[in-house]
């Protein structure tokens, strides 16, 4: 059982390729299921966000595992294996563990330190559990990753310094908003609500608290990122928020939550197909629908009227893109998308406030070492169990032989002989079994377990049970 991580992210691939490998929820579930149906993959989990598509797997062998995952990823995305291998990265064992922990902390994010990725990792765990591809190895690894992410945000200043993709995007998009607009009555800044599962705020902080004061905002989509965006703009003083989603009742629920949480915000839901009709009254559109194609065309935006005197800004956080790039040709219309955000992040805009990265990296290193020590001890445990089981069988066999050869021994003597033989065997096994557990935590720990198996002709069964659908994460299986 070995952990393998294979993926593409904003660090390794162009945005155009990330768009093509982005996986919708249903496709992601099917991909994980098909992966564990191969002989090379025991468990599988997929983390898919606007900036990364990554597969985490428990495999028996490195090369067959990589080959199986690449082949299926190519089939499900339509991207050739040759193109995938040019841009993907592969991490194995300790490096794979370190990578996931760094991802969960936000160290590998486009906006270093952003907290949204922690919730996305948790959702990936839930998805894998739902379809039955989450086993003990990935469940333990994922739970540890969530713990590392929480530590990074609570024990350092990363939570204050690290912006989410939403807050970073709003900061960049805000540069195009009219600076001398007439402010409207708006909500006072509210205390950031916190996600009970991750401990991370469900709205993000902006460097300029007045950036959105009095703005009229439309949010396309009602998923987790859309909810984060809606809460963020409400918290920072937006006067009006329209929510448009293909499932209208989800848009209504989000609008109701905003109304309850921010009394001065006028929030309402509009049918998704009517979204373009409301553009004339909107300053900023935030889109992250998860659709597989354009949801607003340049023609629809142009029909909303001339914006030469009052700009209309689009913040497109979706992959694939939601907003037609041709809107950039329209007077007064500005589009900020993932590609532009990546360029801004590479300029240093995103990481300028992160002051405690060293402390976070230390946390990651500490947790990786602890996780590896536990894994090493777990790996040798079946060998120790098999050794003790074999010794027990030898004891029972010899005692049975003794009873057959000396049937006249009284019960008291027989019991004393039995205790003595078992004590001798236990004492003989105690030191080597304790020592092999200690040695197992070292870099060559597996060698000692293998030596025991060879010397005593052991064949321990190493279980790799899969979490059953419906079992709560972290529960005994």
Swiss-Prot record:
The keyword Glycosyltransferase does not apply. NADP(+) binds at residues 221-226. The keyword NADP applies. Substrate binds at residues 49-52, 109, 114-116, 120. PROSITE patterns: GLUTR. Its EC number is 1.2.1.70. Keywords: NADP, Oxidoreductase, Porphyrin biosynthesis. It is an enzyme of class 1 (oxidoreductase). GO terms for biological process: protoporphyrinogen IX biosynthetic process from glutamate. Pathway: Porphyrin-containing compound metabolism; protoporphyrin-IX biosynthesis; 5-aminolevulinate from L-glutamyl-tRNA(Glu): step 1/2. The record marks 99 as: Important for activity. GO terms for molecular function: glutamyl-tRNA reductase activity; NADP binding. The active site is at residue 50. It catalyses: (S)-4-amino-5-oxopentanoate + tRNA(Glu) + NADP(+) = L-glutamyl-tRNA(Glu) + NADPH + H(+). It holds the Pfam family GlutR_dimer. Belongs to the glutamyl-tRNA reductase family. Possesses an unusual extended V-shaped dimeric structure with each monomer consisting of three distinct domains arranged along a curved 'spinal' alpha-helix. The N-terminal catalytic domain specifically recognizes the glutamate moiety of the substrate. The second domain is the NADPH-binding domain, and the third C-terminal domain is responsible for dimerization. During catalysis, the active site Cys acts as a nucleophile attacking the alpha-carbonyl group of tRNA-bound glutamate with the formation of a thioester intermediate between enzyme and glutamate, and the concomitant release of tRNA(Glu). The thioester intermediate is finally reduced by direct hydride transfer from NADPH, to form the product GSA. HAMAP family: Glu_tRNA_reductase. Homodimer. Catalyzes the NADPH-dependent reduction of glutamyl-tRNA(Glu) to glutamate 1-semialdehyde (GSA). This is Glutamyl-tRNA reductase. It comes from Thermobifida fusca (strain YX). The lineage of its organism: Bacteria, Bacillati, Actinomycetota, Actinomycetes, Streptosporangiales.
């Amino acid at each position: 059982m070995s952990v393998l991580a294979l993926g593409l992210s904003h660090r390794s691939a162009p945005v155009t390729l990330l768009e093509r490998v982005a996986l919708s929820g249903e496709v992601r579930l099917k991909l994980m299921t098909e992966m564990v149906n191969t002989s090379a993959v025991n468990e599988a989990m997929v983390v898919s966000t606007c900036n990364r598509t990554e597969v985490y797997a428990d495999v028996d062998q490195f090369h067959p595992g990589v080959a199986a995952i690449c082949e299926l990823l190519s089939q499900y995305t339509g991207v050739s294996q040759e193109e995938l291998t040019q841009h993907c990265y592969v991490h194995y064992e300790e490096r794979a563990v370190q990578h996931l922990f760094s991802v969960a902390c936000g160290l590998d994010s486009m906006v270093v330190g952003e907290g949204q990725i922690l919730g996305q990792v948790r959702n990936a765990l839930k998805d894998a559990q739902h379809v039955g591809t989450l086993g003990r190895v990935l469940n333990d690894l994922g739970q540890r990753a969530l713990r590392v992410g929480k530590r990074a945000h609570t024990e350092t200043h990363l939570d204050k310094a690290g912006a989410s993709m939403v807050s970073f995007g709003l900061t960049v998009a805000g540069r195009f908003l009219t600076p001398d607009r007439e402010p409207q009555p708006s909500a006072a800044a509210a205390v950031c609500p916190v996600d009970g599962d991750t401990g991370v705020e469900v709205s993000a902080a902006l460097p300029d608290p007045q950036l959105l004061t009095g703005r009229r905002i439309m949010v396309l989509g009602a998923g987790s990122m859309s909810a984060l965006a809606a809460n963020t703009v409400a918290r920072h003083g937006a006067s009006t928020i329209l929510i448009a989603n293909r499932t209208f009742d989800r848009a209504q629920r989000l609008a109701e939550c905003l109304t309850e949480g921010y009394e001065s915000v006028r929030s309402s839901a509009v049918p998704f197909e009517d979204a373009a009709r409301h553009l004339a009254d909107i300053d900023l559109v935030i889109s992250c629908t998860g659709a597989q194609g354009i949801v607003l065309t340049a023609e629809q935006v142009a029909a909303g009227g001339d914006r030469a005197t009052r700009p209309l800004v689009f913040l497109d956080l979706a992959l694939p893109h939601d907003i037609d790039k041709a809107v950039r040709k329209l007077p007064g219309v500005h589009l900020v998308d993932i590609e532009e955000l990546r360029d801004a992040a590479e300029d240093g805009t995103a990481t300028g406030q992160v002051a405690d990265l060293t402390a976070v990296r230390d946390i990651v290193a500490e947790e990786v070492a602890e996780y590896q020590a536990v894994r090493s001890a777990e790996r040798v445990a079946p060998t120790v169990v098999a050794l003790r089981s074999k010794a027990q069988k030898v004891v029972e066999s010899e005692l049975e032989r003794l009873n057959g050869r000396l049937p006249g021994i009284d019960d008291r003597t027989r019991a004393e002989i039995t205790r003595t033989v078992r004590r001798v065997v236990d004492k003989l096994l105690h030191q080597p079994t304790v020592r092999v557990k200690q040695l197992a935590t070292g870099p060559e720990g597996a060698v000692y377990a293998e030596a025991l198996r060879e010397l005593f002709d052991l064949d321990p069964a190493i279980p790799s049970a899969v979490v059953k659908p419906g079992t709560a994460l972290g529960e005994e299986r």
